[in-house]
Amino acid sequence: MKTLSLRVDVDTLQGSLSGIPTLLKILDKHHIKAGFYFSFGPDNSGRAIRRIFRKGFLSKMSRTNPVKLYGIKTMLYGTLWPAPIIFKESKEWMRRAEEEGHEVGIHAWDHVDYHDLLDHKSETWLNQWFQQAHDAFHEVFGRAAKAAVSPAWRCNDQTLLIQEKYGLDYAGDCRGTEPFYPIVQGQVLKTLQIPT
């Protein structure tokens, strides 16, 4: 029998408030457990418009119909509409995922900014970003996070070294076929990477 791992990245407030409850019902019905990884900070989904000039962005938008998928309000968060702090409005559903036996971890503080601006951010910004996510996780679950997965499988030497400070059991920051321990600047890191 093969083992399958199911990773659920919750990127938006809408995903937290309607996606989590829907998925929990489906998973419960089929007796399936998953790993839920939450975005905790501002839902800046509207800022994804910065991607408009990237290759493939417009075709993806025409395929997925983001207004139908996310709703107009979500599409405006962080631009014309204030960005809500996701965990402040969705703690109940985040906790429910863990209560129902699913693994929980950190996906992001600010998903859109990390995804789009990682290569342009300083070590100070990244440290603050990770700390805010870990603080929010602790506020929701009353304990430290043991897992983190990065938005869009984006990482670099700085992010991998910063994660080492948190004593995670594992992270999922890249694509690949088997778990490994990254080597950064000649140092074998202690945080196991489980690619997807």
Task: Please report, for each region that a protein language model flagged, where it lies by residue.
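Catalytic alpha-helical scaffold of carbohydrate-active enzymes acting on polysaccharides/glycoconjugates
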Residues: 1-147, 152-193
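Active-site donor-binding loop signature of nucleotide-sugar glycosyltransferases
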Residues: 196
